[in-house]
């Protein structure tokens, strides 16, 4: 029996692309194909707004190449968020983006670039241009503070089509900020379950925010010490109000951790879940820490491995371990 999976209108964006469920409100969308490739027993089609469609004649999707990756390129950041799962610091190290493994990315791979603050990496522009030459689809996640400080530079990079999606971790929602976000069609606001609440989400809607990605709270890194009962209460409150939250935005997405914490599956029929859920961590995706030269199933995996000679060999290793039920530390 043939199968089809669709990730709709999710800009090739930001961190935790693995397994996102995107449930758009009904709206006509006109899309241009920007990439088509065969992956194992299925075909992948990517559109200019980030929509991705998988199609197969079989009963399941069996990949033989990486589709998307979360990539850390720096551990330097001057903000010091107390919940940062990467433990980034003002004197954190940058990755060497001349590492030859970069050249092994296959065309149309979606690369979610993060840190730290990726905007402070001295090789960022050259790196983005190289990924464009490789026909990859890079995106970035930045903090609101850095988005405001580097707005003109970000707009220039976007206009040069050096990245396709921009995830912005929000700290203080204002009208000026929302207006700036609206200038980048590929921008998606990132919020963390437990650190945001229903009223904040309603305020975003009132200010015209259209795309939101809810990330699960990572009890990892500095986030482990910062976690408390108030955060858990906020998570519980979001979960209890998901029926209302799902109506607020044109596109609402969740990473795998938020899917679990907020019980997102309960919002969908079995048919919708089969269509929109894009897979578990490590099924089509992986995490690469270019600073420490290791890789894992996800950014919260405690089990990490030294970089291999190609990106795809690393993905196939993660997938094989996953299929063998090897504990990967998530």
Question: Where does each model-flagged region fall?
Answer:
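Cysteine/selenocysteine-centered motifs that mediate thiol-based redox chemistry or coordinate metal-sulfur cofactors
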Residues: 317-330
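Alpha-helical scaffolding segments of alpha/beta enzyme cores, especially the outer helices
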Residues: 123-133, 153-156, 179, 199-203, ...
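N-terminal [4Fe-4S]-dependent radical SAM core
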Residues: 2-71, 273
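Canonical Radical SAM [4Fe-4S] cluster-binding loop centered on the CxxxCxxC motif
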Residues: 59-97, 299
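Radical SAM enzyme [4Fe-4S]-AdoMet core and its adjacent flexible, acidic
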Residues: 6, 11, 161-313
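Residue-level recognition of short loop/turn positions
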Residues: 80, 115, 291-292
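Core AdoMet radical
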Residues: 68, 87-95, 108-121, 131-150, ...
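Short, solvent-exposed coil/turn segments at beta-strand boundaries
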Residues: 38-41, 107, 288-294
């Amino acid at each position: 029996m043939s199968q089809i999976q669709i990730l709709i209108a999710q800009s090739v964006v930001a961190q935790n692309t693995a397994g996102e469920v995107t449930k758009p409100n009904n709206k006509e969308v006109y899309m241009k194909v920007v990439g088509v490739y065969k992956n194992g027993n299925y075909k992948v089609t990517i559109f200019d707004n980030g929509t991705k469609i998988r199609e197969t004649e079989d009963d399941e999707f069996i990949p033989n190449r990486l589709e998307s990756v979360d990539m850390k390129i720096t551990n330097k950041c001057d903000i010091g968020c107390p919940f940062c799962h990467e433990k980034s610091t003002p004197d954190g190290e940058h990755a060497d983006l001349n590492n030859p493994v970069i050249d092994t990315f296959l065309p149309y791979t979606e690369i979610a670039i993060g840190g730290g603050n990726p905007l402070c990496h001295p090789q960022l522009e050259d790196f983005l241009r190289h990924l464009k030459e490789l026909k990859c689809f890079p995106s970035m996640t930045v903090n609101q503070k850095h988005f405001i400080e580097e707005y003109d530079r970000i707009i220039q990079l976007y206009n040069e089509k050096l990245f396709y999606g921009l995830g912005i971790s929000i700290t203080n929602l204002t009208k000026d900020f929302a207006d700036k976000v609206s200038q980048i069609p590929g921008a998606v606001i990132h919020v963390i379950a437990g650190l945001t609440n229903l009223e904040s989400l309603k305020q975003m809607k009132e200010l015209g925010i259209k795309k939101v990605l809810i990330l699960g709270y990572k009890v990892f890194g500095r986030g482990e010490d910062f976690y408390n009962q108030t955060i858990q209460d906020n998570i519980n409150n979001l979960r209890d109000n998901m029926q209302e939250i799902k109506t607020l935005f044109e596109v609402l997405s969740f990473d795998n951790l938020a899917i679990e914490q907020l019980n997102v599956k309960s919002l969908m029929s079995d048919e919708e879940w089969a269509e929109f859920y894009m897979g578990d961590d490590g099924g089509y995706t992986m995490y690469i820490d270019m600073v420490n030269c290791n890789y894992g199933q996800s950014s919260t995996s405690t089990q990490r491995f030294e970089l291999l000679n190609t990106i795809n060999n690393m993905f196939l290793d993660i997938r094989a371990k996953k299929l063998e039920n090897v504990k990967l530390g998530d």
